[in-house]
Design a protein with these regions (language model features):
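Short beta-strand/loop motif that positions the catalytic acidic residue
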Residues: 331-333
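Alpha/beta-hydrolase-fold enzymes
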Residues: 204-287
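N-terminal cap/lid segment of alpha/beta-hydrolase-fold proteins
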Residues: 69-112
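Short beta-strand element of the alpha/beta-hydrolase
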Residues: 112-122
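The serine-hydrolase catalytic nucleophile loop
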Residues: 124-136, 150
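Alpha/beta-hydrolase active-site loop
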Residues: 163-184
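Conserved alpha/beta-hydrolase
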Residues: 137-155
Length: 388
């Protein structure tokens, strides 16, 4: 049953017929359970299919939506009176326009040079959520900080919408370093990065090669390539992976015929008053953040093109963590985070200097926005000591 729950999301990405027929096929052909999954799991599956995910759909946002940048404060957090804020745009090396929020200390003397930090959002998130909280708070503490929307997502450009790519998402960190290094008030020798959730893996991978990044911190890090290839807790068998890849491969033909890539199921397009009953703990946790007023944002739909899955299965992230040394790495993880093993395993592979910092009582999503739990003093000290 646990394995059944862990892989429901993967299954939902590839099958889009009637829920009852899907579940029977899922249990019999993929897991050989012959209808023995519990009624609890079946109900959860139906809940995921009908409530959490509104069904796989075609690409949701056009380029016209991307070009109309909002000028109002539309964040999930309050605006600080201790910082200055502006929306900026620049291009990555693929020519994709990246839209970002730039936070600087209030009344900053631009004739001086300041340390700078790039902040990447959780996988499927946007700059108006957790990444913005980190950027604004670090600006309050004296850093120039940039929170960006990844390529193809949020307000950033790129067609088709909601593509997910290990290469390009890593490149987005380097493009942010490009932008910051062109600002007269940024010290090019004092640029660090913060990656939250999936961006933690992208940030580490960018740092492996990009020598301009002098220090890197991750919060609730997710290794998206490992999760896609192996399933959560490495539960996906070789047979299951092959079946999954066959479905994704065929999806490319369907996308080519339609001229529009199909998306994985997405979150509701309006905030929910309460978390649906019957969800497994991991799904319920993500619902708590992304689908309620706590973290809901209309541009954070939690979906990507189905064909994007193939690249993450094919191209692993963080293969050369030891090469980041002698630049320092700080892994921050919640004591009760379901994703904790990603950071622990990456920590083992990394070379010194490195630190694994565990936040007592914190779950995975709590390090997105719980300012009472996020160790900002620790982050400030880490970057002050290493961006010098």
């Amino acid at each position: 049953e646990r394995r059944c729950m862990i892989n429901i999301q993967i299954f939902l990405y590839t099958y889009h017929t009637r829920i009852d027929e899907i579940f029977s096929s899922f249990c019999t052909s993929i897991y050989n359970l012959e209808g023995k999954c519990s009624m609890i799991s079946k109900n959860v599956f139906k809940t995921l299919g009908m409530i959490m995910f509104t069904g796989a759909s075609s690409v949701a946002f056009s380029s016209a939506n991307v070009s109309k940048l909002s000028t109002v404060w539309d964040k999930t957090f309050s605006k600080s009176d201790k910082v200055s804020y502006e929306k900026v745009a620049y291009s990555n090396r693929y020519g994709i326009k990246i839209v970002a929020d730039l936070y600087t200390p209030k009344n900053m003397d631009k004739s001086n040079k300041y340390p700078a930090i790039v902040v990447g959002p959780p996988y499927g998130g946007v700059k108006e959520q957790g990444a913005g909280i980190y950027a604004q708070t670090m600006a309050e503490r004296g850093f120039v900080a940039l929170a960006f929307d990844p390529s193809y997502n949020g307000e950033s450009g790129g067609e088709p919408r909601h593509v997910s790519s290990p290469d390009i998402f890593v490149e987005d960190f380097s493009a942010a370093v490009d932008f910051l290094g062109l600002q007269s008030y940024v010290d090019r020798e004092k640029i660090g990065v913060i990656g939250i959730c999936g961006s933690g893996g992208f940030a580490l991978t960018a740092t492996q090669a990009n020598q301009r990044i002098k220090a890197v911190a991750t919060l609730s890090m997710y290794d998206i390539s490992r999760q896609k290839r192996m399933g959560l807790y490495d539960s996906l068998s070789d047979k299951d992976r092959k079946n999954y890849l066959e479905q994704i491969s065929k999806q490319r033909w369907e996308d080519a015929e339609n001229g529009t890539p199909k998306l994985t199921p997405q979150f509701p397009n309006q905030p929910l008053e309460k978390i649906p009953d019957g969800l497994d703990p991991i799904t319920s946790e993500f619902f708590e953040y992304y689908t309620t007023k706590r973290g809901f944002h209309p541009r954070s739909i939690g979906a990507f093109t189905i064909s994007s899955e193939m690249d993450f299965i094919n191209f692993p992230l963080m293969n050369y963590l030891d090469t980041i040394s002698p630049r320092p790495i700080l892994f921050v993880v919640g004591e009760n985070a379901h994703s904790r093993y990603f950071s622990e395993d990456a920590y083992k592979k990394a070379a010194e200097p490195k630190e694994l910092y565990v936040v007592k009582g914190a779950r995975h999503i709590d390090l997105y926005d719980r300012v009472d739990l996020i160790p900002f003093d620790k982050l400030e000290k880490f970057f002050n000591e290493n961006l010098k």
